[in-house]
Amino acid sequence: MAQESWKKEAEETGVHTPEAPILCVNNCGFFGSRMTENMCSKCYRDTVKAKTVATVVEKKPLASLSSTPLVTEVTDGGSGSVADGKQVMEEDTPKPPSNRCLSCRKKVGLTGFKCRCGGTFCSMHRYADSHKCTFDYKQVGREQIAKQNPLVKADKITKI
C-alpha cells in the first residue's frame, strides 16, 4: 500500500529517486544528491561559500577604486618634471568620535553632547557660552531665515 502511494507521488511530482546512490563529484567518499549538484552537503556548502566570497571580491575593487586617495604630482615651474620624484598623497581618514569632553577631558560615553562646532562636551560644558564655541549661531540663523523667506518683489503698478 505505502509503495503504491510513493509511486503515485513520484509520478505526480515528476521527482524520481535514482536507482543507485550517487557519489560526490569531488570524490570525498560521501553520497551526493541532485539538489546539491551531485555533491555531498559539506562540499556543496564549501562551493557556495567560495562563490559568495568570489562575488564579494569582484564587487569590492570597484568600491575601493572610488575611495582611493587622490595622488597629485608636484611639478617644477616650467620643466614639467616631478619635483624630487615625490608624490603627495591626500588621505581623508575620518577620526573616530571622541568620548571625552573637549573642555575638561571628562569621559562622557553615550551621554555626551555634540556641538555644531564639532566637539563633544559633558553636561557642564554643553552650552555654547560655557565652552567658548566658535560656531556663529546668529549668522546661520540669518541664512536659514533668508532661505526660508525669500524676498518677494512685486512689479511696479503703472498709473492710468
Swiss-Prot record:
Induction: By dehydration and salt stress. One of its GO terms (molecular function) is DNA binding. Coiled coil: none annotated. Transmembrane segments: none annotated. PANTHER family: AN1-TYPE ZINC FINGER PROTEIN (PTHR10634), ZINC FINGER A20 AND AN1 DOMAIN-CONTAINING STRESS-ASSOCIATED PROTEIN 6 (PTHR10634:SF71). Zn(2+) 1 binds at C24, C28, C40, C43. It comes from the Eukaryota. May be involved in environmental stress response. Zn(2+) 3 binds at C115, C117, H131, C133. Residues 73-94 are annotated as: Disordered. Keywords: Metal-binding, Stress response, Zinc, Zinc-finger. A zinc finger (A20-type) spans 18-52. It comes from Oryza sativa subsp. japonica. Zn(2+) 2 binds at C101, C104, C122, H125. It holds the Pfam family zf-A20. A zinc finger (AN1-type) spans 95-141. This is Zinc finger A20 and AN1 domain-containing stress-associated protein 6.
